[in-house]
Design a protein with these regions (language model features):
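Acidic, low-complexity, intrinsically disordered peripheral segments
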Residues: 7, 18-33, 291-308, 314-321, ...
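Small/polar, glycine/serine/threonine/aspartate-rich low-complexity segments that form flexible
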Residues: 54-60, 108-176, 313-323, 356, ...
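Bacterial Sec-pathway N-terminal export signals of envelope proteins
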Residues: 20-131, 178-193, 197-199, 224, ...
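N-terminal signal peptide c-region/cleavage motif recognized by signal peptidases
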Residues: 13-15
């Protein structure tokens, strides 16, 4: 008796543990039957007020590059959309555990029937029977491949037949069954493959997210430098307008004194009008750049920040390190850090798991089967005896009920034991063979993809490094051109004052100076863009900017 009870505990222990793991929270059923939440609450832009400062002309947003990128990471809509891809991949892991979810079921029916008697052995002229079966079962697939079930069934039967010893008759049965694969689907290594695949795909998604965010951060930083360039270009054009106004005023005084021909006044007037147009165009470009910057950091979503001026603290500094880049070192760093290359390599891990899954599908299906049932019988017992005259006599009634049936069932005195082996062997499993072939082809294809990405990484870094070197030289030459433009203007002004030159050449020198200053701004920003692009191509942009993806 004790050994049978111990056997019962061993058999039922997995089901009890499974139930505990399935319902870890008291709110389980509340979550199941709760109304689904379909309304989405979008958060308002955050932390914008942290960078508000009071200036002479009112409040403004003062942003360094770091503070601006912090706002971009907090409020950029495209980055928020990209992050959701990770949630989908995490949900796929949860879904991969679903084959191991236990399943509980219950069934109760009540059937009453009246049938005419066809023989005296039925014990009544009209047989009236009430049958009430109830069944409760619990089943689960374990990571080892074992599929087990535990079920309890009880049936209460009442009848008006005079030949029944039990009325009502209560029959109970406790059944344990299992199926253990021996070849196909055997062991945790095979049955947990979908979970491993989902986790590996999550890592692929995380690498792709990092690559996507890196591109979005690059776009956002380019918007920052667009605004810096527009701001400094406006300053250059305003300075050019001041020079044009000074030249026009001087020409007007000379015209009044008769030192200039009336026909020569049109050139400085035309020059001043051109400078005004350039200033208007620069202001328009500045407004456009500010609007683009607001979109990147989510300020356009908050009415309180849509029209607040933006003050950027970064400038167009001259590069100090003019030493050439070690291109091969940059390539090695890119091969180490590029997230798209990491994602491509991670896909190979997914392919290996897919091949293992396909190999398992092609194996023969050999399973060990087991079945054990313990039965019990109870109810009011009517002993029937036949006297010498052949009449059936009912003896004293022995009361009974469900307890008798359950005690007899747990006594394990009336068992049914069954063991067996089942083999399912497809003669030609073409679908599984095709799946295995496809998985092998996918592994080869993705291996070639890794090689292609490596080639692309190298080319990207070489191109980006060349752009950095070219930008350095362009900034250096722009400084030289600005120095010559300043000297040229000074020389033309002195010659004009001495009467050896005309106003046309002075105006031409002024325009050359404006063009040189504008070229210096453009080349300085182009250098910053090229450095930014190199960081993007080596995969170090987020680390360099101190950005951590949560």
């Amino acid at each position: 008796m004790l050994s049978r009870f111990f056997l019962l505990l061993v058999i039922t222990a997995p089901s009890v543990c499974a139930q505990i793991s399935s319902f870890p929270r008291p709110s389980y059923f509340h979550e199941i039957f709760a109304r689904p939440v379909t309304q989405v609450q979008l958060q308002a832009p955050a932390h914008l007020s942290d960078y508000l400062v009071e200036g002479k002309e009112g409040k403004k947003l003062e942003l360094s590059l770091k503070s601006y990128l912090d706002l971009v990471m907090a409020n950029n809509t495209d980055i928020a959309v990209s992050r959701l891809t990770v949630s989908v991949a995490e949900n796929a892991i949860t879904r991969a555990f679903s084959p191991f979810d236990p399943f509980a079921s219950g069934l109760f029916t009540s059937t009453q029937s009246k049938t005419p008697s066809s023989t005296v052995l039925q014990g009544a002229s009209t047989l009236d029977t009430l049958t009430q079966p109830a069944t409760f079962s619990f089943s689960q697939l374990l990571p080892t491949g074992t599929n087990y079930s535990v079920s309890f069934s009880g049936t209460k039967t009442s009848t008006n037949s005079s030949y029944q010893n039990y009325d009502p008759s209560i029959a109970t049965a406790l059944t344990f069954s299992f199926t253990q694969p021996l070849i196909k689907n055997r062991g945790t290594g095979v049955n947990r493959l979908p979970i491993l695949i989902a986790r590996s795909r999550l890592r692929v998604t995380e690498y792709n997210l990092r690559d996507s965010v890196m591109q979005l951060v690059m776009n956002a930083e380019n918007a920052y430098w667009d605004l810096v360039q527009a701001r400094d270009n406006l300053k250059v054009q305003e300075k050019g307008l001041e020079l044009a106004n000074e030249a026009l005023k001087r020409s007007q005084r000379e015209l009044e004194l008769g030192a200039m021909s009336p026909l020569d006044i049109y050139q400085p007037e035309q020059n001043r009008a051109t400078a005004e147009i350039s200033v208007l165009q620069a202001r328009f470009a500045l407004d456009q750049s500010e609007d683009a910057l607001r979109k990147q950091m989510g300020a356009d979503l908050d009415p309180a920040f849509r029209h607040i001026p933006i003050a950027l603290t970064e400038g167009t500094e001259v590069p100090t390190d003019m030493s050439p880049l070690d291109v091969e070192t940059e390539v090695r760093r890119a091969l180490q850090y590029r997230p798209d290359l990491k994602a491509a390599n991670q896909v190979l891990d997914v392919d290996d798991l897919q091949i293992r899954t396909a190999k398992n599908s092609i194996m023969p299906d050999l399973s060990l089967l087991g079945f054990y049932t313990s039965q019990g019988q109870g109810g009011d017992f009517y002993p029937l005896t036949t006297n010498l005259s052949g009449t059936t006599v009912v003896g004293p009634v022995t009361p009974g009920g469900v307890g008798d049936a359950v005690n007899q069932m747990f006594g394990f005195g009336y068992p049914v034991i069954e063991f067996g082996v089942q083999l399912r062997l497809p003669i030609r499993n073409r679908a599984a063979a095709a799946d295995l072939a496809d998985a092998t082809v996918a592994k080869k294809r993705d291996s070639l993809t890794v090689r292609s990405v490596e080639q692309t990484v190298r080319l990207d870094v070489l191109t980006a490094a060349s752009q950095v070197e070219s930008s350095k030289n362009s900034v250096k030459l722009a400084h030289v051109a600005l120095d010559f433009a300043q000297k040229y203007l000074a020389a033309e002004q002195k010659k004009y004052e001495l009467g050896t030159s005309q106003i046309y050449f002075v105006l031409q020198a002024q325009q050359s100076l404006v063009n040189a200053e504008s070229a210096l701004v453009q080349n300085s920003i182009a250098y910053k863009r090229s450095v930014l692009n190199l960081l993007r191509r080596t995969g170090e942009l987020l680390d360099e900017r101190g950005i951590q993806l949560q």
